Amino acid sequence: ATTFLVLESGQPVEERLSRTYIEGNSALHNVRIQYDGNSGLMAGADFTRYHSPGFQTFVDQSHETTVTDMQNNSKQDISQGALFINHSHTFETGWALNYGVHGGFTSSKTYIDYLYNKGNGYEPALDELENNRQKEYSGNAFLEVSKDFGSHFSATASLKVEYFKSDYTSNGMKSTLWNDWTLFPNATLSYTVNPMHIIQLDISSDKTYPSYWDVTPQESPINSYSVILGNPSLKPYRSYSGQLIYILKQKYTILAFCDYVPDYFAQLPYQNTSELKNVFRYENMDYQLQFGVGVIVPFRVGEFWNSQVTLSGQRMQEKLDHFHDLSFHNEKYTGQFKMDNTFTLSKSRPNLKLDLNGYFVTGAVQGIYDLGHLYDVSSALKWQFADDRATLILKCNNIFRSNMPHTMEINQSGQYSRLWKLDDQRCVTVSFVWKFGGYKKKQHEAVDASRFGKSM
């Protein structure tokens, strides 16, 4: 529940109370068939099914009067299939060749209705009903070559070409969201001066697509003066990254990096020009640019303490010239400290280890937002017994409930707001693992569900 007091010159105080109740669940099923041949041939098929129903109740009151009493039902059904074939071959000259093709199809169905109680029970608002379907067709082919030139220099280069088309049907109206070709160059160069000094250059490119829910023209109220909207005009963004890495004594790492992301998108707020309401919506920016340096230092203290420290500093820049009658070009220098520790409390009978990890970030920018600092401390106590076949793990994440920005502030073109979020993501878990004989867990490619479900 949230309470707001709106003060206007010459007018009495108005108190608004809003209550939101949200429930939902999701189910994901995946089937993958893959053939790995001795000649370097790999072929297979993959199918994923996702289902997620949801329900929301929103009540907004002013004194004793109900302004809005709304119920919202939603449902998302996604079917995704893919076929792929890859082949790798190593020649006697030392050259290695890897190539393949991949084709995919996705169908995402989204249903949303809104029911309002105006004194005679909940009645559907037929003009707000959303019954949408998004169909995606994708195909790509890639070629990768690599070679070791003696004992000092090695190189890997690849190029992928992708075709992607997305058709959208909203309440019977058809449109095309995206229809384009994209090239993805990647390269890795490594030079070993000697085993104590190694230099590596990595260049990569990628593409990120918005979730199916975020391009749906839906509306989800947060409170009396805030709402989340979908953005059917949202575009995918490309990312280009470069890293120069120096490894000293096969132990210490120093790196410099740069990331350029045109059309980068993030959820940003803006003020509605027709009513007193803050609108949160995913928006494409002109670009995001980050560059900086970092260092990774591992160390040990006897057999008791094994640790790794990571320090990095970077400059962040995000720009958008046309943002709902505003524009922004925000820059910020930020730093990060991260430390991972493993303490061996006892090596045998009992075999006890304590993991204690933490990080601190000085702040960041996200579009029009200026984000405050955040930090996180998590730990895990592991007890191995029964000849190390059994493991009991007690884990606590986000111990101090601090892994969200301390403040989210906007001070732009006469618009000022400050948002505090309640961090309630602390989690304590207990798990038990038993290893049967010489069983080794097989490695499986994780299902990419990054575009499934709702993002709040």
Regions found by a protein language model. Give the residues of each.
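Transmembrane beta-barrel architecture of outer membranes
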Residues: S26-N30, A82, S138-N140, D180-T188, ...
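Face-selective signature of the C-terminal outer-membrane beta-barrel domain
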Residues: A1, Y21-S170, T192-I198, Y252-A256, ...
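Outer-membrane beta-barrel signature, preferentially recognizing the C-terminal barrel domain
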Residues: Q134, K207-A256, Y260-P262, N278-G292, ...
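Outer-membrane beta-barrel translocator domains and adjoining extracellular loop/strand segments
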Residues: A1-S18, P53-E64, K109-K118, D167-K174, ...
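Transmembrane beta-strands of outer-membrane beta-barrel pores
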Residues: F47-P53, G103-K109, V161-D167, I203-Y209, ...
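Outer membrane beta-barrel strand-and-loop segments of large Gram-negative receptors
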Residues: Q80-A82, E128-E130, K235, S241, ...
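Conserved C-terminal beta-signal and adjacent last beta-strands/turns
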Residues: N330-M456
